[in-house]
UniProtKB/Swiss-Prot annotation:
Belongs to the fungal hydrophobin family. One of its GO terms (molecular function) is structural constituent of cell wall. Residues 1-25 form the signal peptide. It comes from the Eukaryota. Self-assembles to form functional amyloid fibrils called rodlets. Self-assembly into fibrillar rodlets occurs spontaneously at hydrophobic:hydrophilic interfaces and the rodlets further associate laterally to form amphipathic monolayers. It is found in: Secreted; Secreted, Cell wall. Disulfide bonds join C27-C85, C34-C79, C35-C67, C86-C99. This is Class I hydrophobin 12. GO terms for cellular component: extracellular region; fungal-type cell wall. Induction: Expression is induced by natural light and low temperature. Keywords: Cell wall, Disulfide bond, Secreted, Signal. SMART domains: HYDRO. Aerial growth, conidiation, and dispersal of filamentous fungi in the environment rely upon a capability of their secreting small amphipathic proteins called hydrophobins (HPBs) with low sequence identity. Class I can self-assemble into an outermost layer of rodlet bundles on aerial cell surfaces, conferring cellular hydrophobicity that supports fungal growth, development and dispersal; whereas Class II form highly ordered films at water-air interfaces through intermolecular interactions but contribute nothing to the rodlet structure.
């Protein structure tokens, strides 16, 4: 009887933990992205490996480099860069503009 109760409790904990897995629903404009680089921008900005990008007079967080969607896979690869949610992608997909940091 004791082993059945332990098994039931363990299964319940696993089910609750699986339901608590972070999701990417924190971003209303698309998937949460994992990007190699982020930088606060204001006016013309020089980005490592890309060159100068004119963002006008906006003061915004930009993400650039290798950006890929963060997938909520239990035990999957972790983001080694910065997780961000961006309003749009500009400059032929090289730079994501209007980003905010996201805790995943």
């Amino acid at each position: 009887m004791f082993s059945k109760a332990t098994l039931f409790f363990t299964a319940a904990v696993v089910i609750v933990a699986a339901g608590a897995t972070p999701t990417t629903s924190q971003c209303n404009t698309g998937p949460v992205q994992c990007c190699d680089h982020t930088q606060q921008a204001s006016g013309p900005t020089t980005l490592t490996g890309i060159g100068e990008v004119d963002l006008g007079d906006t003061s915004t967080l930009i993400a650039y480099g290798n950006c890929s969607p963060v997938l909520p896979v239990l035990g999957g690869p972790k983001c080694q860069g910065q997780t961000v949610c961006c309003d749009n992608t500009e400059f032929e997909g090289l730079v994501n503009v209007g980003c905010t940091n996201v805790a995943v």
